[in-house]
């Protein structure tokens, strides 16, 4: 079998907005402030930009985890911009996040209100992986290479 270097054809051009990735996930939640607190305090992400409305309500935040960004937006009523909590549906995607300690992050997420869907277990490809639903309805596969 031929060894493949998956990064041979990766575009090396910098993004026009410094600090952004070429592909960024954008999610919608009812309370951006609570979501930012959960992602930064529990999951050890960093909020690098926040935008408030005139009343001081947080509407938007750009969050970073080990060089990858995602955006947290305020869900809007009567709009297609809804959170899984609004729709009572399973999200159509799952975040796959690598960490240094799956068991610790799983426990910390559960203690902060996430629901464990699958306890940490070894996968055939060599990851220890757990699946959780965060308090905002999004699913996370938390993994570490073992």
What are these regions (language model features)?
Residues 29-33:
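Short acidic-aromatic low-complexity motifs
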Residues 136:
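C-terminal catalytic core of tyrosine-transesterase DNA break-rejoin enzymes
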Residues 2-26, 37, 43-100, 106-133, ...:
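Vicinal oxygen chelate
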